Amino acid sequence: MIYLRKANERGHANHGWLDSWHTFSFANYYDPNFMGFSALRVINDDVIEAGQGFGTHPHKDMEILTYVLEGTVEHQDSMGNKEQVPAGEFQIMSAGTGIRHSEYNPSSTERLHLYQIWIMPEENGITPRYEQRRFDAVQGKQLVLSPDARDGSLKVHQDMELYRWALLKDEQSVHQIAAERRVWIQVVKGNVTINGVKASISDGLAIWDEQAISIHADSDSEVLLFDLPPV
């Protein structure tokens, strides 16, 4: 089964300094049909105006991933980290027993565009941590998150994998799905056809009870592929 979550059907909140689209229920957006998918709890597509950002606030027992698409985010947290995360890089934070952090757009002229993704951990009460990394493969399917941090990927405390998959126009490829696993695909750019279903930038696809995904790039495209545990 494939369910297409169209970009314009997501929850939307424009706060002036922040324009945010919510794939799943978040803050004042609530839809009981979209509370998450497997271990995925939040996919927020955020545009933050120059000099603006999220002030210091707490989190607990959540894996929080940021993928910067445009601009740079300045991260500070209660573990003493102060880092700049430029476009193309991923950062992950295990909130675990508790953490406080802020995320700002340090530019005085340029906007910041990012995905903020929350993943429920396999267990609560883990030690907080922070990592960031650039993945340099321009094309193909590259492992970004895994439970064992293999092949240079970032560690995630969950039985899941995240791939960044970049394809040139008319390229076609296949991803096998293990029994009972679930897959979420988020289209970062371009237009793709997945098992016959057409999707475009900012669309999402929930996939279950499928043995494989066949993806065709209708234009130069990039997707995030989440290989998730059974429900």
From Swiss-Prot:
Cofactor or coenzyme needed: Zn(2+); Co(2+); Fe(2+)
Keyword Disulfide bond: no
Binding site for a divalent metal cation: H57, H59, H101, E103
GO MF: metal ion binding; quercetin 2,3-dioxygenase activity
Pfam entry (one): Pirin
Pathway given in the UniProt record: Flavonoid metabolism; quercetin degradation
EC number: 1.13.11.24
Assigned keywords, A-Z: Copper, Dioxygenase, Iron, Metal-binding, Oxidoreductase, Zinc
Keyword Ubl conjugation set for record: no
Catalytic activity as recorded in UniProt: quercetin + O2 = 2-(3,4-dihydroxybenzoyloxy)-4,6-dihydroxybenzoate + CO
Cofactor info, note text: Binds 1 divalent metal cation, Zn(2+), Co(2+) or Fe(2+).
Job description of the protein: Has quercetin 2,3-dioxygenase activity in vitro. Its physiological role is unknown; however, may provide a mechanism that would avoid inhibition of key cellular proteins, such as DNA gyrase, by quercetin.
Homology family: Belongs to the pirin family.
Additional remarks: Quercetin is a flavonoid compound synthesized by a variety of plants, including foods for human consumption.
Domain remarks in the Swiss-Prot or TrEMBL record: Is composed of two structurally similar domains arranged face to face.
The protein, known as: Quercetin 2,3-dioxygenase
Origin species: Escherichia coli O157:H7
High-level lineage: Bacteria, Pseudomonadati, Pseudomonadota, Gammaproteobacteria, Enterobacterales
Gene from which this protein is expressed: yhhW
